[in-house]
């Protein structure tokens, strides 16, 4: 457990590694502010909808995340599981470029980030870039659909098949292409 830190998130990632080691094919770890009544990534600085602030990010959440995620990746690598395990850490949107009156940041769907590791992907690859304030993508915007297509393709599912609607229109099963930049 020391490798993952002492946080709830670290304990959940350790359990995830144990599940993967036992053959589980997909594990999801979610952190919401209702989880164990503690601060999480919902950073509005408002006790009614997301109590965390940027100071909580700096002092607690980011160090816990860094320790736990790096512990998971190191542990998977030491056990020979990292090449066969795809780890994705992301939220469903970004955060406003400007701090609100409560020292938090609100929802911002136009610009977001994520981490994809393991799975025989090229390490250190960066796909896309934002402007200096993380307001807008300025190079190679990535959509959540592309991340979904990447996960599905990595799992060996063909993302090209078409589905037929009631009116006989053929639509792609997943209308996005995988992030091929992640494979060297």
Where is each model-derived feature located?
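Ligand-binding pockets and gating/stacking loops
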Residues: 1-184
